[in-house]
Amino acid sequence: MQTFLYPRTWLILGLLLLGSGCAVTPKTITQVPNTARPAAPSQAVYNSGGIYSPATYRPLLEDKRARLVGDTIVINITENTSATKSGSNSASKSGAVNAGITGLFGHNVPKASFNAASDNAYDDAAASNSRNVFTGTISATVTEVLPNGHLVVSGEKQVAFDRGTEFVRFSGVVDPMYVAAGNSVPSSRVADARIEYRTNSNLDTAQVMSILTRFFLSFAPL
């Protein structure tokens, strides 16, 4: 006795496989790696007896601020962007034709005339508004110190819930001059900033439904 699976069963199995493959860490647009460990201090070949070391230099008369690879810095995310776009088109066209007949094949005929007129108008208008607000705080790690002293920072925050995990990622280049008291800097002062908020929950999966799933649903919806 042979057992056959109905097309609906195959469809359910395929969707289950697709759903299991969607529960993965979403891709990122930020610079990786998202963290770095400080380098081990090099062994001094010659000891002059002084207490100053350029490799571990920390100012004594200012707050602790990020300077070296592995240091952390607080990023205050305060992004508020808006865009407005509008456009309009219009066109019009009109025409008229007048014709008259006084004779036909050499014979006089009663006066006849023909009149025709046309008038076309077209108007089109469109408008689009977009606004995005992203606020929050994330601690990032210095992953590289550029020759000019600027800091390449990158960080990730993960918050797990019952049905998914939220990912907040940030990367960019920080000028130490803009680092305020408390070792923090606003995101508006970060160059090449890349900020993202992603989830691997069902909500994010529904928004990025795979092409294969759409193919199945197109001819055999549940």
Swiss-Prot record:
Originating species: Methylobacillus flagellatus (strain ATCC 51484 / DSM 6875 / VKM B-1610 / KT)
Protein's cellular compartments: Cell outer membrane; Bacterial flagellum basal body
Q: Which GO terms describe its cellular component?
A: bacterial-type flagellum basal body, distal rod, L ring; cell outer membrane
- Residues annotated for lipidation of the kind N-palmitoyl cysteine are C22
Query: Encoded by which gene?
Result: flgH
Q: Where is the lipid attached (S-diacylglycerol cysteine)?
A: C22
Query: Signal peptide location in the record?
Result: 1-21
Transmembrane parts of this sequence = none
* The name this protein goes by in its record: Flagellar L-ring protein
